[in-house]
Structures are given as structure tokens and as C-alpha cells.
């Protein structure tokens, strides 16, 4: 069943694809399909939808591919590269199976660079950029989806069965407007806030505060198995970051 397959030169990614899979989710449920596949406009990203209409993002896809290779002794003692945004659930699940996992900065070019540096071949981003250097030299959504389908066929398993040992940690991401995020993140006040927030989270999760590379914003992400902790810390940190932005703006006048 095809969806959003009538391009006119202007409607690329318009209410469809990996960044807007809502219609696909409904179509999967309506047709009792086993799987939905959403690519982005240039085909280098892919997001999946299970039979219940739930999103399976790039983190879960990387886990599926890594485990399939591991179970068939094809990982060849290598590991997986993710980014600072990759869910902790991936890291913990892979390490439970003795699969090394390392993070790099956001961006498929950074994933590629880290793979080459480590001599590994599998990595990806939550957004659905998946790289398998055994199959292609860049992210390719079609190849990635075929590899997932192959894993389902070879293991005679549904997509949910392939993910039965994978637990995605609850997370929240907010973007806070800031004129010069690259400079703000370097300030003493921001560095102290990051250190304190990391200490407060402890081993219950992860705090990521970074400058956006594409927009004038500070990105704040909290990730924890304890949702109550996220709900408590998120508004507190948002308020503190906004206060620092206000104070720094006053100092620069």
C-alpha cells in the first residue's frame, strides 16, 4: 500500500514521510498491516511503524540490526556508534549483550567519522539516519528497511518480537531561544548548571544541555527511567537557563 507517492516538485516531506508519519500510522492500523515504512524526501532516513501504529525510531532500528548481526556472528567484534541524542535504552540493551557502544556529536557525518575512526561499520541517529558500511557508504533508508525486513524473515519474528528486550527510556526535549547559544554554553554559569544537573540526575538517567548547531537555541534533553524525575527537573532547568540568558544579555549591553 503506497502513501504520499505523487510528487509535484513542491510537496516534498509535506505532511508525510519520516518527519510526519501520522497518516502512515493510521493506514497501518486501518489495514491491519505488519509494518509501515516512512522515508524522508531524499531517502536517507527511515522510520518504521509497528502493527499497533507505534513509531519505531532510528534508535530501535539500530538495535534490531545490531542484534541480528550479533546473533549470526556477523558483528565481527565491532560495536555501534550513536549520538549524544541516542536513547539510553539502546546503550544499556546493547551492553547487556556485550556489544560496545559509543556516542558522537549529532549528524550523520559525525557518525560516519566515528565509525571510520573505530574501524566499525554500524551506527545511526534517532532521526532514522542509519549507516551500515558493509552495505553502503552513506545513510540509505531503502537499504535500512530491507535489512530490517530481512531480520524479520530470517528470525521469523514480528518487529515487536525483535524489540522484546529493548526498553526505550522516557525522555523530554525542549528548545530555548537564545541569541548566541554557542557562546552562552561556554559561560561559567552554564557550565556550573550542567555539572549540577548531571550530579542531580546521578545514575538514574542523563542530562544533555547543548547549543543547537542549526538554530539560535539551547537544547535541553532529560532522559530517565523515572518519569517523575524528568517532570521535576525539566521546568526547573528551563527556568534556570532562561535566567542565565537574561543575565548574560544584560551583561552584554
Please place each PLM-identified region on the residue numbering.
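Phosphate-binding chemistry for phosphorylated carbohydrates and sugar-nucleotides
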Residues: 1-155, 168
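Mobile late-domain/C-terminal helix-loop "cap" segments
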Residues: 95-253
Amino acid at each position: 500500500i503506497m502513501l504520499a507517492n505523487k510528487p509535484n516538485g513542491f510537496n516534498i516531506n509535506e505532511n508525510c514521510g519520516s518527519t510526519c508519519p501520522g497518516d502512515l500510522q493510521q493506514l497501518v492500523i486501518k489495514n491491519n498491516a505488519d509494518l509501515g515504512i516512512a522515508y524522508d524526501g531524499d531517502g536517507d532516513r527511515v522510520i518504521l511503524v509497528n502493527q499497533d501504529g507505534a513509531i519505531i525510531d532510528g534508535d530501535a532500528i539500530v538495535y534490531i540490526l545490531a542484534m541480528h548481526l550479533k546473533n549470526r556472528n556477523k558483528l565481527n567484534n565491532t560495536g555501534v556508534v550513536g549520538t549524544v541524542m541516542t536513547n539510553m535504552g539502546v546503550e544499556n540493551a546493547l551492553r547487556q549483550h556485550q556489544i560496545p557502544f559509543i556516542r558522537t556529536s549529532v549528524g550523520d557525518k559525525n557518525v560516519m567519522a566515528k565509525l571510520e575512526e573505530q574501524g566499525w561499520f554500524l551506527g545511526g541517529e534517532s532521526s532514522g539516519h542509519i549507516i551500515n558500511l558493509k552495505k553502503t557508504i552513506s545513510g540509505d533508508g531503502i537499504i535500512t528497511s530491507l535489512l530490517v525486513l530481512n531480520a524479520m524473515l530470517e528470525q521469523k519474528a514480528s518487529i515487536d518480537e525483535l524489540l522484546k528486550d529493548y526498553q526505550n527510556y522516557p525522555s523530554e526535549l525542549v528548545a530555548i531561544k537564545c541569541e548566541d547559544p554557542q557562546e552562552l554554553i561556554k559561560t561559567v554559569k552554564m557550565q556550573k548548571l550542567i555539572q549540577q544537573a548531571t550530579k542531580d540526575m546521578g545514575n538514574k538517567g542523563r542530562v544533555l544541555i547543548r547549543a543547537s548547531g542549526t538554530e539560535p537555541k539551547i537544547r535541553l534533553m532529560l532522559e530517565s527511567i523515572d518519569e517523575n524525575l524528568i517532570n521535576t527537573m525539566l521546568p526547573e532547568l528551563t527556568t534556570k537557563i532562561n535566567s542565565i540568558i537574561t543575565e548574560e544579555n544584560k551583561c552584554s549591553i
